[in-house]
């Protein structure tokens, strides 16, 4: 598995544990993913994969209009993709 795929899978696994209706902050995702992968991915690597997963509609994000902070959740398509792994 290449590094990008490993990071994407770690993100999907992390978001799969978030209770329905709730969102996970960018910072929380980064911390959890960095603990799962050795060597730990950089912030830029994780941000790139978050954007790619969003473009693929496997996750969806909501931006706070005041702080700019992103919060994420896994989509049904993301759950299905994770089940295929």
Regions found by a protein language model. Name each.
Residues 14-18, 36, 60:
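Alpha-helix C-capping/helix-to-loop hinge sites
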Residues 21-34:
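Short acidic, hydrophobic short linear motifs in intrinsically disordered regions
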Residues 1-23:
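Short alpha-helical segments that sit at the start of domains
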Residues 39-56:
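Short amphipathic alpha-helical interaction segments
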Residues 54-64:
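A short, conserved structural fragment
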Residues 66-74:
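Minor-groove-contacting beta-hairpin "wing" of winged helix-turn-helix DNA-binding domains
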């Amino acid at each position: 598995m290449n590094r990008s795929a490993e990071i994407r899978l770690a993100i999907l696994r992390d978001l799969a544990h978030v209770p329905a209706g709730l969102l996970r902050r960018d910072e929380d995702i980064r911390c959890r993913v960095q603990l799962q992968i050795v060597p730990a991915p950089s912030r830029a690597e994780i941000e790139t994969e978050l954007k790619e997963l969003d473009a693929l509609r496997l996750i969806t994000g909501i931006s706070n209009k005041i702080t700019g902070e992103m919060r994420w959740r896994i989509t049904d398509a993301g759950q299905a993709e994770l089940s295929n792994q």
